[in-house]
Swiss-Prot record:
Keywords: Disulfide bond, Ion channel impairing toxin, Knottin, Secreted, Signal, Toxin
Expressing tissues: Expressed by the venom gland.
Domain comment (free text): The presence of a 'disulfide through disulfide knot' structurally defines this protein as a knottin.
Function: Probable ion channel inhibitor.
Naturally occurring in which organism (per UniProt): Cyriopagopus hainanus (Chinese bird spider)
Any one Pfam family match given in the protein's UniProt record, by short name: Toxin_22
Name of the protein described by the UniProt record: U11-theraphotoxin-Hhn1a
Keyword flag Transport: no
GO MF: sodium channel inhibitor activity; toxin activity
Amino acid sequence: MNTVRVTFLLVFVLAVSLGQADKDENRMEMQEKTEQGKSYLDFAENLLLQKLEELEAKLLEEDSKESRNSRQKRCIGEGVPCDENDPRCCSGLVCLKPTLHGIWYKSYYCYKK
């Protein structure tokens, strides 16, 4: 019976001493991994920031370009007076001097091309 107790006590002491050493090693490993994780997080954050900036630049570029499908705003329709220097006629219309009718009003009107 004493042999069992001594064996048990010996195994217990070894487990506690080795467990304590493993605990210190684990703590050091966790600190190293945490430091590495921070550097990885910084790298990932910078990469994400670059991608977001590229995406923002693309979106702003697309907004600045005029789409073919976009509707013209504040354009002048056919037969409406326009300014010779700043014609705002709708697409398919040109600002021209009128022939016969309308010559007594303004000097230029929007007409079909």
